[in-house]
Structures are given as C-alpha cells and as structure tokens.
C-alpha cells in the first residue's frame, strides 16, 4: 500500500479494480476543510483518462508492473509480433492494443512491453524515434523567413508538421509523446 501523499508522475496503482498510471497530480490544502489530492489517472488496459480525488493520507495499492525489453519484428495481418531479446520468446499483440504506438514502430526497433502478471498492458516507446520522410512538398527558396511549416508523411504513415527545409528522403527525429518534429537526424 502507498499513501496518496507519495504520488508522483508515472506511479502505477490499483484502484476500483483497474490498473492506473498517475499522469498528473496536485496536493490541495483548502483554507477550510481537509487536504486532498486531485489526480489524473490513465487506465493501462483501456487507455482512458479519469480524474479522481483522494483524501490526504488515503492508502491505495501499488500495482506490480514489469517491463520487458522486446524487439518489434513484423506485422502479420492485424497481429504485431515482438521478440523478447533475452529468451527469444515471441509475443503477438493485436492492432487495437497498440493502436497509438503503431505510427512510431519500425521493424527491429527495441521497445519496452508493460506486463501485469501474465497480462500484456501495452508498449512503451523511446522518447524519440528516427523516421524517414516519404512524401512532402518541395521547399521553395526564401520560405524560411516566415518560419512556417508544411506537412510531411513518414515511412510509418505518420503526418508531422516540419520546417520548409525538410525534403523527401530526410531522416527526422520525432517526439513520440506528441508526434512533433524535433530535428533532422
């Protein structure tokens, strides 16, 4: 058990029969009444976000989450195959389980698979990934003064806004948390 006063971003807890990750939290001490903790939690099974308020000092169960380093091998229909890098066991995840992460996954990429006992909860991507631009409009000379951007399609199908100097075939560093352009690789 862990006190809600010890909440921190990224902590995984069990509440109301679900497994939740703390996305955001705030300790509130009103002038009148008891203190409480307002939190934003993400359900690791469904991906849904819920706001929940706890009384200060309330105890919740800490979920025993394990992460395994695995390599993304290939897609087989709507199943995606990952291999454990230490035991070489293969794991298949459905497209619905990793829908949001698919636009960043490349073959042979190392990722963290989040496990709760024998249940697979999802995929944790690295903070940034390198993707190649397969389609974008050519940059026009002199466009850099406005500081604007144009859409570019990457090899995984992700559409990202990039500066005008980016061309087809360039490798880009993309932030996986929000899908934004970071730099050229």
Swiss-Prot record:
The molecular function terms of the Gene Ontology recorded here are: translation elongation factor activity
Q: What would be one Pfam family of this protein?
A: EFP
Keywords linked to the UniProt accession: Cytoplasm, Elongation factor, Protein biosynthesis
Q: tRNA-binding as a keyword? A: no
Location in the cell reads: Cytoplasm
- Please indicate which superkingdom the organism of origin belongs to: Bacteria
Q: Which NCBIfam families match?
A: efp, PRK00529.1
Please identify the protein, giving its name as recorded: Elongation factor P
């Amino acid at each position: 058990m862990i006190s809600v006063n010890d909440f921190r971003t990224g902590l995984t807890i069990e509440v109301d029969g679900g497994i939740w990750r703390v996305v955001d939290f705030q300790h509130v001490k009103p002038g009148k009444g008891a203190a409480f903790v307002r939190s934003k939690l993400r359900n690791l099974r469904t991906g849904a976000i819920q706001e929940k308020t706890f009384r200060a000092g309330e105890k919740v169960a800490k979920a025993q989450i394990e992460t395994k380093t695995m390599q993304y091998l290939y897609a087989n229909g709507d199943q995606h195959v990952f291999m454990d890098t230490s035991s070489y066991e293969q794991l298949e995840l459905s497209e619905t389980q990793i829908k949001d992460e698919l636009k960043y996954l490349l073959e042979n990429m190392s990722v963290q698979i989040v496990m709760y006992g024998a249940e697979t909860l999802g995929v944790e991507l690295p903070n940034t990934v390198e993707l190649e631009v397969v389609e974008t409009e050519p940059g026009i000379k002199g466009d850099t003064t406005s500081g604007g951007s144009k859409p570019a399609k990457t090899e995984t199908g992700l559409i990202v806004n990039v500066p005008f100097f980016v061309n087809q075939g360039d490798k880009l560093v993309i932030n996986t948390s929000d899908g934004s352009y970071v730099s050229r690789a």
